[in-house]
Amino acid sequence: MTFRHCVAVDLGASSGRVMLARYDSKHRTLTLREIHRFVNCLQKTDGFDTWDIDSLEKDIRLGLKKVCNEGILIDSIGIDTWGVDYVLLDKQGQRVGLPVSYRDNRTTGIMPQALVQIGKSEIYRRSGIQFLPFNTIYQLRALTKQQPELTAQVAHALLMPDYFSYRLTGEMNWEYTNATTTQLVNINTDDWDDTLLAWTGAKKSWFGRPSHPGNVIGDWICPQGNRIPVVAVASHDTASAVIASPLANKHSAYLSSGTWSLMGFESKKPYTTDEALAANITNEGGAEGRYRVLKNIMGLWLLQRVLKERRITDLPALIAQTEALPACRFLINPNDDRFINPDDMHAEIQAACRETDQPVPVSDAELARCIFDSLALLYADILHELANLRGEKFTQLHIVGGGCQNALLNQLCADACGIRVMAGPVEASTLGNIGIQLMTLDELNNIDDFRQVVSANYDLTTYIPNPDSEIARHVAQFQPKRQTKELCA
C-alpha cells in the first residue's frame, strides 16, 4: 500500500487536537492536517481541581468522526496525553471519584511523608524518577488517606491516555512510557514496584503489567462500521515528542517546550547515581528501550496564566513589545513551587521579585520579559547539570513543541546556553505518536528511520548563540535566584 492514514489524538494540559497524517511510503513524505482542536482546562468540582474528561472524550470522538465522514479509511489511531494523572474505575468500568488534576493541592505535604517512611534514596533506587509533589505515587496516597471510602469501589486505575483508549475500544492497557511518570514503576523490572505501590494504599490488582509502545490495544468501530485499530503509542506526550525530535547525534539535547518544558537527552542506560539524585534527574521510559534522562521545568504555564489573567489575546504583539525591553531586569526561578497553581500568577511573580529586592515587573511586556529571561537562564543551568551528569558537553539543542514558535525565547535560550538551537517541529508530540503507528503498520523500521522522515519533511529554524548578549553575561549570576523552594524534595 502506498498511502497510510493515521490519526493522532494529542492531549496537552491546556489544549487537545485530533490530527490526520498521510504517509506516502514510496516517496517517504509525511503530512499533517488538523481535523479538530479544542480547549483543555481545569475546573473546580467539589473543591478539587479536575479535568473535564467527558468533554475531552466528546471532542476526541467528534474529531474521529470528522475524519470518517470525509470518506478516509483510517489505518490506525493513537492517543498521547500529559502524565501522572489517572481515572479510577469499578468492576463495571464506571468511574469512581473525580479525575483530579496534578495541580490540585491535595498532595501538599504527602511527598515528605514518603521521604521519611521509605527514604529518598530508596525511592530513587527503585524508580529512577524525579521527585515532584504531584507524581502519581503521592496522588494515590492522598486519595487513599483522604477518601478511603472510595478505595473499596475501585477495580482499575488507568492513566489518562489508557483511559481514553479504553473508552474507544473497551480494552484496558497500561502503556510503559506514561506509567514511568508515576514514580511507581521499578526501573529494573519495568513492572509496578510492590514496595512503592503498597505505600500508596492502592492495590496492585488495579494495574496490569505495563506494555511497551507498538501493540494494538483494540479496535474502535467508526460510524461507517469499520474496525480501526487503536495502537499503544508512546502515550506520554513528551515521549512522543522526543521520538519526533531529529536529534543529530549523541551530543544533541532536546527541549520539549509547551505548558511544561522538559529538557534532557536520550540514553540507552538510566542515570541513578547519587549525583543524579542530588540534581533531581528523572529517567522516564522511552520507546525501543531508550531512556529520557531529563528535568521538568515549569515552562510556558507561567505565561499562559498571565495571558489569561490579564486578558491578553495578541501574543505576537506582546512578544514584540517584550523584545524591545532590556534583558534580565527581573529574574525568578520558574521552578519555584509557588508557581504550580497560584491564585494570581502575575501577583506571585511580582511578589517573588519584590522578595529578592529586584525591580517589580508591572506591564504585560515586563511580566513576559521576566518569564522569558528566567526560563532561558534556567534552561542554561539545567543543560549544564545534564552535561556534567553524562560527562560530555552538548553541541546542539533541539526545541520542539508549541513553544518552539517563540523566536525570542529560542534566541534567548541559544544565547544563555551558548550552543546552537534548532527549533521544530512544532507538532512533535503528534508526529511521534504517528511514528509509532507507522512502525506498528510496518511502514518504518525504527525511531532512527522515522527521524529521517521528519528531517526530510519538516524545516527547522537555526539560532546561533551570541556570547556578547546581555543574557549570556547573566548566566553565572543566576545561581542565587535558584535558592528557592523548587519542585523537588
From Swiss-Prot:
Which cofactors are required for activity?
Answer: Mg(2+)
The GO molecular function terms of this record are: ATP binding; glycerol kinase activity; rhamnulokinase activity
Active site, renumbered: D237 (proton acceptor)
Annotated pathway: Carbohydrate degradation; L-rhamnose degradation; glycerone phosphate from L-rhamnose: step 2/3
Q: Which residues bind ATP per the record?
A: A13, S14, S15, G16, R17, T259, Q304, G402
Keyword set for this entry?
ATP-binding, Disulfide bond, Kinase, Magnesium, Nucleotide-binding, Rhamnose metabolism, Transferase
- Please state the Enzyme Commission number of this protein: 2.7.1.5
One GO CC term of this entry? cytosol
- Which cysteine pairs are joined by S-S bonds? C68-C222, C353-C370, C413-C417
State the reactions this protein catalyses.
L-rhamnulose + ATP = L-rhamnulose 1-phosphate + ADP + H(+)
Q: Which domain of life is it from?
A: Bacteria
Q: Which InterPro entries match?
A: ATPase_NBD, FGGY_C, FGGY_N, Rhamnulokinase
Pfam families linked to this entry? FGGY_C (PF02782), FGGY_N (PF00370)
Known role: Involved in the catabolism of L-rhamnose (6-deoxy-L-mannose). Catalyzes the transfer of the gamma-phosphate group from ATP to the 1-hydroxyl group of L-rhamnulose to yield L-rhamnulose 1-phosphate.
Q: List the NCBIfam families.
A: PRK10640.1, rhamnulo_kin
Query: Can you say what this protein is called?
Result: Rhamnulokinase
- The record lists the organism as Salmonella paratyphi A (strain AKU_12601)
Task: Provide the taxonomic classification.
Answer: Bacteria, Pseudomonadati, Pseudomonadota, Gammaproteobacteria, Enterobacterales
